[in-house]
């Protein structure tokens, strides 16, 4: 798709990437300087703009290219998995003392995951937005658990106002909890023990702020 219209360019890119509102290119965060200080739809004030959805979009990526890269790396797969598990276990152990303030991830029974990331949920009395911004200020990237409660995003504004086009079953209390209190940090296999230890130290410092 080619266009010389900046607005169409933004909309096209949003549709390509799940309908996200953020226009920061991959690898660059908070280029607008307002990642954590605005309110969208019915989301909480300060919800991470990288995970605000203003359109009903698609996951349109170069999947053939991604598959080719995956095939080229398949021999490294066991090493990647073991390192992710190692990083997860090290971070989990380092943060064990914070379980009065945070809900830390545990594997499901009879499972041995290759961890995508390290999911943290703040308990009552711990401000996720404040904690995440402190962690980010120390050079550690964080991410939301995607949309949380999707119907509170701007993409639902019109349907919410008209009260039609979708239905809700139950209270959605868990999606609301995720939306308000949950975030990721990484366990990328290229991370060293020193980086994992630094991340744990910063998270614990953030809880004291």
Q: Where on the chain are the PLM-derived regions?
A:
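PLP-dependent aminotransferase class I/II
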Residues: 4-209
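Glycine-rich phosphate-binding loop of ATP-grasp-fold ATP-dependent ligases
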Residues: 1
């Amino acid at each position: 798709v080619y266009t010389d219209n900046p607005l169409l360019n933004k909309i096209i890119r949003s549709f390509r990437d799940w309908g996200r509102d953020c226009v920061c290119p991959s690898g660059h965060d908070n280029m607008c300087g307002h990642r954590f200080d605005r309110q969208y739809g019915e989301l909480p004030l300060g919800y991470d703009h990288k995970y605000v959805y203003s359109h009903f979009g698609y996951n349109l990526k170069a999947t053939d290219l991604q598959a080719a890269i995956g095939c080229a790396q398949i021999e490294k797969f066991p090493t990647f998995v073991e390192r992710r598990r190692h990083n997860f276990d090290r971070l989990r152990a380092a943060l064990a003392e914070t379980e009065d303030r945070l809900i830390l991830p545990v594997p499901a029974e009879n499972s041995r995951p290759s961890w995508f990331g390290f999911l943290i949920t703040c308990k009552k009395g711990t401000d996720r937005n404040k904690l995440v911004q402190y962690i980010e200020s120390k050079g550690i990237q964080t991410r939301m658990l995607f949309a949380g409660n999707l119907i509170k995003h701007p993409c639902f504004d019109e349907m919410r106002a008209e009260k039609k086009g979708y239905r809700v079953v139950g209270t959605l209390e868990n999606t609301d909890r995720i939306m308000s209190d949950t975030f990721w940090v990484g366990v990328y296999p290229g991370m060293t023990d020193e980086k994992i230890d630094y991340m744990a130290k910063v998270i614990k410092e953030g809880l004291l702020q």
